[in-house]
Amino acid sequence: MPDHTSIPADEAADRLAIRELVDAYAFCADARDAEGQKALFTDDTHFVVYMAGEGSDATDDLRGRESLTPVFDNLNTYEVTMHFNGQSTVALDGDRATGQTYCLAHHISARDGGRELMIAAIRYQDAFVKTDRTWRFAERRLYVRWIETRTLEAAGVA
């Protein structure tokens, strides 16, 4: 574990900016802001999804910011989503960084006259790059660790 009793202001600013980038991704997802979400990525980004977790074949392997539109638009199939980012790590190397973040993503949809909740436990593995003083995702790998699906009670509508 790094010793953060005293870190340079620029390192602190970079770490905060990267955390804000990770959180902005979740906020944009829940707000159905696909354009805002895409803007968090470099033009030549690489985005890979592994629905069966680590060690599985990729279910989506996308290159370029514009290729992300269908993935982000897919969230519109749900009534509401809520992404909770948890623990994360970041390793800085100048204007590049790597990191990982754990997330519980909640998805509510209409199903058979009722509502269904699908919770996905996700681990993101990221490569970040800073250009023009702004951090963006150069690569994002999304690993689904497990999924739980259950029927919701009638109370507590979005």
Model-predicted regions and their roles:
Residues 8, 12, 58-62, 115:
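Charge-dense, low-complexity intrinsically disordered segments
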Residues 2-7, 76-158:
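A beta-strand edge to alpha-helix "cap/lid" segment located at domain peripheries
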Residues 14, 18, 30, 61, ...:
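Aromatic-acidic/polar surface patches that form glycan- and anion
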Residues 1-43:
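Short, low-complexity N-terminal intrinsically disordered segments enriched in polar/charged residues
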Residues 24, 67-70, 123:
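Alpha-helical elements of Rossmann-like donor-binding domains used by nucleotide-donor carbohydrate transfer enzymes
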Residues 26, 72, 147-148:
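Enrichment for repetitive, rod-forming helical segments
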Residues 1-8, 20, 51-55, 73, ...:
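A near-ubiquitous, low-amplitude feature marking generic local secondary-structure context
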Residues 34-104:
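A solvent-exposed, acidic/Ser-Thr-rich amphipathic alpha-helical stretch
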